[in-house]
Amino acid sequence: MMKDGLYDLFCESLESLALKPGQQLVAALGGGADSQTILDLLMRFRQQNPQYQYLAIHLDHSFHPSSADWSSTIEHAAKSYGVKTVFEPLNVPIENRQSKEAAGRESRYRRMAELTEDDAVLLLGQHRNDQIETFFLQLKRGSGPKGLSSMAAIQPWVGSRRLCRPLLSVSKEDILSYAQQQKLTWIEDDTNYDTRIERNFLRHKVVPLLEQRWPQFGNSVLRSAKLCAEQQQVMDELLQEKLYKAQKHKSHFPLSLLSEHSAAMQRALLRVWLQGQEYSLPSYEQLEQIRLQAQSATDDSQMQVQCDGYSVRYFQYALWCDNNTGQLPADCWLAEANVNLGEWGTLSVPDALLTNNNELRLTFSLTSEKLAKPGRQGRKKLKDWLKQAGIPPWLRARRPILELNGKYVWVAGLGWFSYQVIEKTEFDSLQLPEPDWVSSGADSYRQL
């Protein structure tokens, strides 16, 4: 493919995104010829399209002893374009039974989402050869149509962000030819030839042998991946329609919906909903645990199926996803209206609570004292108010609580409570604005 042909293909990919002026286009730089080609094509595109924002990101997870030198080389090449760049070292936590490569990939994508705007388009250099290898890896894992679809040319990402792979139909040979013609600088990572790594084994041992025997084999793989993607899209559309008709509101998925269908349909419905909630899909075994346990679950059974980064629970005839949070913030006295709770979000309180020598404390501890709500008859324990509000048991201890002069006055999700502050003067919470709790998602729940 001629270099102008590659550029035309790149432009067609971006035009299909229906970009808006000011939207951010981000080149993800890994250092190889493919990502350097993406950057060069993007910079050519910038010359004719200055109405967008442009950014190049390289994250060094230090897996290779020469990675720091490589980063310096890549950064110098990127800055020669005069584009805004972000070059950072990246700490990669590796969990049990997780490969180093998978951990690095997850950490990179997570950090790039943090560094980009909500509607950004992240441009990736993955190509035809990568797509064929991905198909084989999914086949090895026993994947269905969704997995065998491999990588999409354009796909949703975090928030309103999207991933775009303009070179997905282009061979590695054509990319190298372009990079050489443009005299680009790139890194040859020697670990790419380590056939102990699954993808490298496929790249150097398996795919060349198959294409030597059947020259059109690669094209057939790409066609199968495309057909799987189309089949999956049709199935998802039908399942989403079925879910929509059954839901009373967006976060609710009644278990009665599962009882109306076969086991295969139950699994498909669960997969589609989890995907729509932006959770990673569970394994087949985990999905079966969810499906089977849900059929006999009760509020007292404390059902909990652990998945990757979340767990599935049962409450009030529905399944819920819990984000598997860490330690709660420590109780603290408040001297300012705005409080940063780290991974739990932010809390803004009315200034009136911080005047008149009031002692205002933030806590997550549930009191056994009975509380009254303005305009409501009777007094109840806080746990009973939370239960009445339909808040699942595992979330009841995760609600920020404001304690004024030793008395609970506000609970996130429940609102104001009333009490006597000084002698017989009633605390008039109805005249105070509601505190603003913006959750970062660490405490949040979603219903299946």
UniProtKB/Swiss-Prot annotation:
Its EC number is 6.3.4.19. It is an enzyme of class 6 (ligase). Pfam families: ATP_bind_3, TilS, TilS_C. ATP binds at G30, G31, G32, A33, D34, S35. GO terms for molecular function: ATP binding; tRNA(Ile)-lysidine synthase activity. Keywords: ATP-binding, Cytoplasm, Ligase, Nucleotide-binding, tRNA processing. Coiled coil: none annotated. It is found in: Cytoplasm. GO terms for cellular component: cytoplasm. InterPro entries: Lysidine-tRNA-synth_C, Rossmann-like_a/b/a_fold, TilS/TtcA_N, tRNA_Ile_lys_synt, tRNA_Ile_lys_synt_N, tRNA_Ile_lys_synt_subst-bd. PANTHER family: TRNA(ILE)-LYSIDINE SYNTHASE-RELATED. HAMAP family: tRNA_Ile_lys_synt (MF_01161). NCBIfam families: lysidine_TilS_C, lysidine_TilS_N. Belongs to the tRNA(Ile)-lysidine synthase family. The N-terminal region contains the highly conserved SGGXDS motif, predicted to be a P-loop motif involved in ATP binding. Ligates lysine onto the cytidine present at position 34 of the AUA codon-specific tRNA(Ile) that contains the anticodon CAU, in an ATP-dependent manner. Cytidine is converted to lysidine, thus changing the amino acid specificity of the tRNA from methionine to isoleucine. This is tRNA(Ile)-lysidine synthase.
